[in-house]
Design a protein with these regions (language model features):
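Bacterial Sec-dependent N-terminal signal peptides
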Residues: 1-10
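Compositionally biased, intrinsically disordered/low-complexity regions enriched for serine, proline
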Residues: 1, 21, 30, 96, ...
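Carbohydrate-active catalytic/glycan-binding domains of CAZyme proteins
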Residues: 9-555, 591-595, 634-638
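Lectin-like carbohydrate-binding module/patch detector with strong preference for beta-trefoil
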Residues: 552-694
């Protein structure tokens, strides 16, 4: 199969350019987000596990458009071999966990836990650094820190049994003898805590994963309790179901397995949520007084993404969503600063942008901020020279043990990563190429045995190896990874001219797993399989093409289309009886044909081609979705973009969705809370263009 060269340069941003945004904020992994506001600036810190530089910090002015501005450290400053992938020791899925970012006393604080090392704190006067590291030790993880009004500093931590510990003001460690239980086991409270003091009341936002993910708030007039708790969001998956988890057999020598290990991918239950529900994250008050949550959500092999959710205070509780549909949040909503009250008109941002520059020509003196090393690198064994990245080949049995592997997160929903590879510097036993750091891993690359070069595609899940002899007179090839990450699959391809690409190997299934606790990552690597240092490989012009980043045509303005309900696979019909109903599957008649009326800022009205407009009467119950001939009375919906021509229609009156039961035979209603994980409860729709007859 020949594939054309990737062409587009646009990268995913949540900003729709019309005064609205669509979740996720980033279509790549950003785990355990913690949000901080300082004046009119907003900062987001996230987990980086075993990757360095570590403890990433993003900056925003509007909560929608973000920029990567800092890391708290360039490399782990611990000396144990496991931080550097030495002597078969590793920290996959360990390292930096669940940071907490705070600002007090004129400086920034970022707290985190490092497995086996305890509580760590990084401080800086300037958010851009330099950062000072304080090893506070102590068994405190998934913590939140509160600088209270009386000058005391408290850390909230623990799962189920939630504890509070006072910290020393000089960051030397926890204060001895101050730990007390503030919420006892049995109250349904989990971990991933975020503590706030608002109008004299203490609010603790926590997440739980048993039996599935949800977010809970606990509140008290005293930090020591007693606390009352309630769930503030549950079941909000935006139509994503539980992921397939990698299963590693017992008895393997290493946690990450090894070549020959018989991995398995777990069963996918499309009706289950697991941790695809919006869960761990923080809340923040925007400068206009509105409140927002930034919670993470599992997006399968992509990893854990961040979603921005509007909040409503009711009876002293910060609830996700709006009256009439608390606990659920729109996937598309008006940008902060414009969504005053229950609804409003958005204003476009001057410069919508992605947080990272993903493509890299390696011409600069430093790597772009999107790149991270897999564990600590050996800085003597890599370099940027003559516009290329050079990786020296260090001894390793396979990719997951290869030092100096340079990675960046894959980006969804679909993307194509391509890199130029130069192999004239290889020696016997060297392996280099483009890989996927995951458990199990995979890669495509060049292997040198003696003087012969072999193009190899390797998939660890099945332990399949595909080899082909390749001639590279100029020592140059192009490698590519084609990813459909919403559907958890990817395939490799190669080229010898940079124009025509040939696929290699199968379309591989991808998964999430609890070993590295990360989604899939592109990897540039070079290692030697013969137990010695080899030569070197050089990389140039790494590009990421995102075919679905441009969503400007996702709303079918200026088109005539049918509306297909994913639950019934039947088209909606403007029934002559005056109800919105469904018709037989292949009905192409005029009464199944619709057009959109653009109301601005993502708001639309629905018009049947016979001239009637959809209008919701009463409470929006089944049979209340009817019609009017007056365009001024037409219902105004906020279009919810679910990609691939799938969408939902959100009422700006009751904050519920248009839908039809797939089982009862009832007509359409306007009372759906949101989609189910399989998108088959009757609320997720798909538009199909009706072509004009010649």
């Amino acid at each position: 199969m020949l594939l054309p060269m990737a062409a587009t340069a646009q990268s995913w941003t949540a900003d729709n350019g019309n005064g609205t945004f669509t979740n996720p904020l980033f279509y790549d992994e950003f785990s355990d987000p913690d949000i901080l506001r300082v004046g009119d600036d907003y900062y987001l810190a996230g987990t980086t596990m075993h990757a360095v530089p570590g403890l990433v910090i993003l900056h925003s002015k509007d909560l929608v458009n973000w920029e990567n501005i800092s890391y708290c450290f360039d490399r782990f400053d611990f000396t144990e071999d496991r931080f550097s992938l030495k002597n078969h020791e590793e920290i996959y899925g360990q390292g930096v966990w669940a940071p907490c970012i705070r600002y007090a006393n004129g400086q920034f604080y970022v707290y985190t836990n490092v497995n086996g090392k305890g509580l760590q704190c990084y401080t800086a006067k300037d958010i851009h650094g330099p950062w000072e590291h304080h090893n506070m030790k102590g068994n405190i993880y998934d913590l939140s820190v509160l600088f209270d009004d009386d000058g005391k500093i408290y850390a909230i931590h623990g799962y189920g049994e939630v504890k509070c510990t006072e910290l020393e003001p000089d960051m030397s460690g926890p204060k001895e003898g101050t730990t007390r239980t503030i919420i006892h086991e049995g109250n349904g409270v989990g971990e991933g805590h975020h503590m706030y003091k608002i109008d004299g009341m203490y609010y603790l936002i926590s997440t739980d994963y048993r039996p599935n993910g949800r977010t809970r708030c606990s509140r008290s007039k005293s930090i020591w309790g007693p606390y009352e708790t309630r769930v503030i969001t549950a079941d909000e998956t935006y139509g994503y179901h539980a992921a397939s988890l990698t299963q590693v057999p017992r008895g393997v020598k290493y946690r990450i397995g090894e070549d020959g290990t018989k991995f398995a991918l777990g069963h996918v239950d499309k009706d289950a949520t697991a941790c695809t529900n919006a869960h761990q994250g923080g809340i923040v008050q925007f400068k206009d007084g509105t409140w927002w949550a930034l919670l993470m959500q599992d997006f399968h092999s992509i990893g854990r993404t961040v979603c921005l959710m509007p909040m409503t205070w009711t009876d002293g509780w910060p609830m996700i969503g709006f009256k009439g549909n608390y606990g659920r949040a729109p996937r598309t909503w008006f940008n902060p600063g414009t969504a005053l009250g229950y609804y409003g008109l958005g204003e476009p941002v001057d410069n919508p942008h992605a947080p990272y520059v993903r493509s890299e020509n390696f011409d600069a003196k430093q790597l772009g901020r999107v790149w991270q090393w897999n564990h600590n690198p050996d800085d003597k064994q890599w370099s940027l020279r003559s516009g290329k990245l050079r990786l020296n080949s260090l001894p390793a049995e396979q990719l997951m043990w290869a030092r100096n592997t340079l990675t960046q997160r894959v980006i969804g929903p679909t993307s194509v990563a391509t890199v130029e590879l130069y192999v004239k510097g290889l020696k016997d036993g060297d392996v280099c190429g483009l890989g996927n750091i995951n458990v199990p891993c995979s890669w495509i690359g060049i292997v040198k045995n003696g003087k012969a070069l072999t193009l190899r595609c390797f998939e660890q899940l099945t332990n399949d190896t595909i080899d082909t002899t390749i001639e590279l007179p100029k020592g140059k090839s192009w490698l590519r990874c084609i990813g459909d990450y919403d559907n958890d699959q990817a395939q490799y391809a190669y080229s010898t001219d940079g124009v025509n690409f040939q696929t290699m190997g199968r379309m591989m299934p991808l998964s999430y797993q609890l070993i590295s606790f990360q989604g899939s990552r592109h990897a540039l690597f070079a290692f030697n399989t013969k137990g010695k240092q080899g030569g070197y490989a050089e990389f140039d012009n790494f590009t990421v093409d995102e075919p679905m980043a441009d969503r400007s045509k996702n709303i079918p303005f200026d088109k005539t289309f049918r509306i297909i309900n994913l639950a019934t696979n039947r088209p909606a019909v403007c029934d002559p009886h005056g109800l919105l109903y469904d018709s037989r599957p292949n009905d192409q008649g005029r009464l199944t044909q619709f057009q959109l009326v653009d109301r601005g800022t993502g708001q639309v009205s629905l018009k049947c081609v016979d001239g009637r407009y959809v209008k919701v009467y009463g409470e929006g119950l089944a049979g209340d979705v009817r019609f009017t001939t007056d365009p001024k009375e037409a219902e105004v919906f906020l279009w919810q973009d679910y990609l691939n021509q799938e969408f939902m229609l959100l009422s700006l009156k009751n904050h519920r969705y248009l839908g039809k039961s797939p089982t009862t035979g009832s007509p359409y209603s306007m009372d759906y809370a949101g989609p189910d994980p399989a998108r088959r409860n009757g609320s997720v729709l798909k538009w199909e263009e009706v072509k004009a007859e010649n």
